[in-house]
Amino acid sequence: MLTLTERLPQAAPADATLTLPFEVRQKSRFRATLDDGREVGVMLSRGEILRDGQCLQAGDGTVVRVHAAAEAVSTVRGDDGLALARACYHLGNRHVPLQIGAGFARYLHDHVLDDMLRGLGLEVVSEQAPFEPEPGAYGGGHGHTHSHDHSHQHDPAGHAHEH
């Protein structure tokens, strides 16, 4: 079985492709099937999400390009920047991984979040599309991972949700 162990710093000519959903692209060690049907093991250093177009290399020099799989997402589109900013605020306040693009915001499909945003007057479309969220909130960014089994204080002005 081919084992991919190195992230290449830039795109390179690929010998094969590997299409993965976001859930798997967050992991550093997993088994998968290349798009040509061959089995592959991935053993990378922790801390980075695999991005669409990123290339990985095996010890024998084989290069594999990663593709983001189309998956169930919810997309908020609009020309009203304030409405989109409001949507991003509410989703970010819930620590939802979020893809932000020109005129849209996208998250992994969640009917509860869809209903919340529709309640704010936004149009939400459920669709199949690649999901490439902003990198800051996970994979080396600021996570909110401290334990909540202890007493602590947050400045209410500096922290937007209750514990």
Curated annotation (Swiss-Prot):
Keywords: Chaperone, Cytoplasm, Nickel, Nickel insertion. Residues 130-163 are annotated as: Disordered. One of its GO terms (biological process) is urea metabolic process. The keyword Chaperone applies. One of its GO terms (cellular component) is cytoplasm. It comes from the Bacteria. InterPro entries: UreE, UreE_C_dom, UreE_N, UreE_N_sf. The keyword Cytoplasm applies. Its main location: cytoplasm. It is found in: Cytoplasm. GO terms for molecular function: nickel cation binding; unfolded protein binding. Residues 146-163 have a biased composition (Basic and acidic residues). Involved in urease metallocenter assembly. Binds nickel. Probably functions as a nickel donor during metallocenter assembly. Belongs to the UreE family. This is Urease accessory protein UreE. It comes from Alkalilimnicola ehrlichii (strain ATCC BAA-1101 / DSM 17681 / MLHE-1).
